[in-house]
Amino acid sequence: MSRVGKRPVAIASGVTANVEGQTVKVKGPKGTRSFTVHDDVSVELKDNVIRVAPRFETKRAQSLYGTARAQIANLVEGVTKGFEKKLEITGVGYRAALQGKNLQLSLGYSHDVVYPVPEGITITVPKPTEITVAGIDSQRVGQVAAEIRGYRPPEPYKGKGVKYANEFIFRKEGKKK
C-alpha cells in the first residue's frame, strides 16, 4: 500500500492557503485554485502545513486520502511554479502555428486542424515543430496536451506525428520483399 497520504503538504512562501470545511483554497503568484476533498477524508491546516487523514478505516477512505494529498500538493505546486508539457511534431510538412486564440496544426490531412486554446491554459509555439502547453492545473495541462497529441499520434514505422518531448516511440520494421 502506498503511503503518499501520510506526508504533509508544506505551503511555500508567498502562498496562502485556507481550509473551509472540505474545500482547500490556495492562492499564489500564478493564480488561485480550489479543491473539494471527499467526505471520507479530513483536512487540517496548521503552521503552514496541510495534513490529510482518512476519517474512517475503510478501504475507500484509505485509497481516497492519498489521492487527496497528491491533488492538494498539485494545487500548491501549480500556483507557485505551474505545470508544462512539451510536444514535438515529426513529419514532412507537419507544423504548428498560433493564430490568436487558436492553435493551427498542419498534420498531413486535407485540412488544417484548428484547436481553440481553453481558458487558463497558455500554448506557445517556439518553433513550428514544437508546442509548449502551460498552466496552473496539472490535469488540464495534461488533458490539452493529450488532445493535441490525439489529432495525429506517432506511428511506429516512421515515427511521424505529435509526441511528448520525453516519449519514446517503439519502432517497427517494415515489410520485407
UniProtKB/Swiss-Prot annotation:
Q: Does rRNA-binding show up as a keyword for this record? A: yes
Give me any GO biological process, just one.
Answer: cytoplasmic translation
**Which Gene Ontology molecular function entries are recorded, alphabetically?**
rRNA binding; structural constituent of ribosome
Taxonomic lineage from the root: Bacteria, Pseudomonadati, Pseudomonadota, Alphaproteobacteria, Hyphomicrobiales
User: What protein name applies here?
Assistant: Large ribosomal subunit protein uL6
Q: Which family does it belong to?
A: Belongs to the universal ribosomal protein uL6 family.
User: What PROSITE patterns does the entry give?
Assistant: RIBOSOMAL_L6_1
Assembly and partners are described as: Part of the 50S ribosomal subunit.
Show the GO cellular component annotation of the record: cytosolic large ribosomal subunit
**What is known about what this protein does?**
This protein binds to the 23S rRNA, and is important in its secondary structure. It is located near the subunit interface in the base of the L7/L12 stalk, and near the tRNA binding site of the peptidyltransferase center.
Query: Which keywords accompany this UniProt record?
Result: Ribonucleoprotein, Ribosomal protein, RNA-binding, rRNA-binding
Q: Which domain of life is it from?
A: Bacteria
